[in-house]
Amino acid sequence: MKHTLSVLVEDESGVLTRIAGLFARRGFNIESLAVGPTEKLGISRITMVVPSDERTIEQLTKQLYKLVNILKVEDITNLPTVERELMLIKLRVSTFERTEALDIINIFRAKVVDLSEDFLIIEVTGDPGKIVAIEQILSKFTISEIVRTGKISLVRESNVNTRSLLKEY
C-alpha cells in the first residue's frame, strides 16, 4: 500500500539529505516527494508517498523522529485530505489535431501556458486521479515531455472524506 507522510522539519541545510539517507539505508523507495515552506517562518513541510506496509511505516516514523530537525511525522494516508499535483506536458500537435487537444484541455480545466506552431505546453493541477486521466487521454497525441511535482496534501478540518464518497458511486 502507498502511504502519504507529512513531515514538519526545521528549515535547515542537510535535513532532506538525512531523510533520504535514512530511506536509502533501510532500502525504502520514495515514490513522490514535495518540499516547501509552511505558514511558520523557518518550518518546512515534506510530503512523501512511500510504498510500504503499516508496520514498516510505523518503524520508519520512529526512525524519522530520531533525526535532528524533525518536528512532526504524520501518516495521513487514511485521513480525509485535499491532495494536489501539478503536471506540465509538452504536446506535439499538428494544426489538424490542435482543436481536439484544446477541447480535452478545456474539459480538464487545464491551461495552455505556451504554444508554437507544432507544440503546446499544458499545465494541469488536480488530484492524482485527474493527473493520470489527462495524461492517458492526451497520449493519443505525441507527448514530447512530461514533468510532475510530488503530491502535496493537507488534512481536511471538515472531516469530509472524498475518497469514501467516490467509492459509493
UniProtKB/Swiss-Prot annotation:
* Pathway assignment: Amino-acid biosynthesis; L-isoleucine biosynthesis; L-isoleucine from 2-oxobutanoate: step 1/4; Amino-acid biosynthesis; L-valine biosynthesis; L-valine from pyruvate: step 1/4
**Organism's domain of life?**
Eukaryota
Tell me which EC number(s) this protein carries: 2.2.1.6
GO cellular component terms, A-Z: chloroplast; cytosol
Q: Where is the ACT domain?
A: 4-78
Which reactions appear under catalytic activity for this entry? 2 pyruvate + H(+) = (2S)-2-acetolactate + CO2
Where does it reside?
Plastid, Chloroplast
Keyword presence, Methyltransferase: no
Q: Which GO biological process categories is it annotated with? A: isoleucine biosynthetic process; L-valine biosynthetic process
Its EC top class is transferase
Similarity comment: family membership? Belongs to the acetolactate synthase small subunit family.
Share what the entry says about its subunit structure, partners included.
Dimer of large and small chains.
Name of this protein: Acetolactate synthase small subunit
Gene name for this UniProt entry: ilvH
